[in-house]
Amino acid sequence: MIRSYRQRGHLIAKLDPLELLKSDYLEELHPESYGFKKEDYHKKIFLDGVTNKQHSTIKEILEFLREKYCDTIGYEYMHISNPTERKWFRDRVEIADDFQFTKNGKEAILNKLIQAEGFEKYLHTKYVGTKRFGLDGGESLIPALEQIIKIGGQSKIKEVKIGMSHRGRLNVLANVLQKSYKRIFNEFAGEINSTSEDGAGDVKYHLGASSNREFDGNSVHVSLTDNPSHLEAVNPVVLGQTRAKQFFHQDKERKKVIPILIHGDAAFAGQGVVAECFAMSGLPGHNTGGTIHIIVNNQIGFTTSPRFARSSPYPSDIAKMVDAPIIHVNGDDPEAVVYAARIATDFRLKFNRDVVIDLICYRRFGHNEGDEPSFTQPLMYKKIRSHPSPVKVYGEKLVHEGSISKDHLNNSIKKFKDLLDDQFKNAKNYKPKIEWFEGTWSRYKPESCLLYTSPSPRD
């Protein structure tokens, strides 16, 4: 029974914030399947250290297993062939008592959620109908990324390379890479134009950025790679950049530079380049020491429901080809999301292997903000329109448990809104600089990129 929970407990975990998915009754997760009767539930059983206990009752074992494997996090690690890795993961789930957050930690998570949600709402208000491919519904991604970078800094990581498509990119740029809000507002207003020196002229949700982030006195250089609209095409580019950075850092152990790839659920399961990158991940000439994959699983691919988009239960199933552990987590529980990021980062740093976080959330608006999603998913969007935002869910949880006051929550939201108002006011006069000719590239000078066409033989 204990083994069944380790293998299949995720199938009845509370992973869907919309509660659209109904869990099946699984006989192997019930004591009756193993010959136990109701009157046996309070009898002591000798466990010999299994679940880190010598003796326990059936009732206590069930409570323990359901808490660890069937709450807002579901784990898949029993498919891992390496017994050391499998035991490490099992002990981390069952024995480690680190799924706890201090008052300051909870406030830090809340503040990142306020930034993520407040930024999307502000753009939605100021630039109605403008494409931004918002993160609305998946805002827990932001505190998760913060956690990965923070742990990386504590582990003396020098650089983090991030690759992602357009969904949520502006939010990551602003609230993780610290690209100024006024610059993004300036781009929305159409004030920034491509010059003959930069030759860019790309849409704002394709652009990259880089910055130095400091956590607890540790500095980490974080960069987000530019990408095209072609989903997952950026993956091999990020992995190649990571490998090159490791070379220049003389990082033979692959622990100074780590890649993070952020995927959509439909693209992760459907795009062949994902499987190709997994297939090459263990090769000596291509190995980067493991990638942290985060699937922003909003349970829809443009207008396609999951049951019409893939043949496997989860979009993450393709990762089992390389024995990658998979952590499924409910996006409406930001503490669980941050904890999942913590485990994933620790696993990658210890074993130098790929790991996947399946962040199950939803997409509050259409594929882009000009679409009306209720035409193709009427039942889903009826549910979404009445569903509270992550800030409301988590903020009320903290107020209820006494971690913060209602006034503190409202003041934090207002303070961030005031900051955005100030940035919006100054956006029109913002003067950008060509940042990609700095640092290592400072000895190179931009050439004119004005289009020139050679005369053809017919001219």
Predicted segments, located by residue:
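Conserved phosphate-handling catalytic cores of large alpha/beta enzymes
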Residues: 306-309, 323-353, 361, 365
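Extended, charge-enriched "interface" segments that sit outside catalytic cores
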Residues: 1-141, 157
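Cofactor-binding active-site loop characterized by glycine-rich and histidine/acidic residues
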Residues: 161-323, 327
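Conserved small/polar residues in nucleotide/adenosyl-binding loops
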Residues: 452-459
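Conserved thiamine diphosphate
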Residues: 215, 314-340, 386-407
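Active-site pocket-lining segments that scaffold enzyme catalytic pockets across diverse folds
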Residues: 123-182
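Beta-sheet entry/capping signal
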Residues: 10, 149, 156-161, 256-260, ...
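Glycine/aspartate-rich loop-and-adjacent alpha/beta segment that forms the canonical ThDP
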Residues: 5-45, 49-64, 72, 180-183, ...
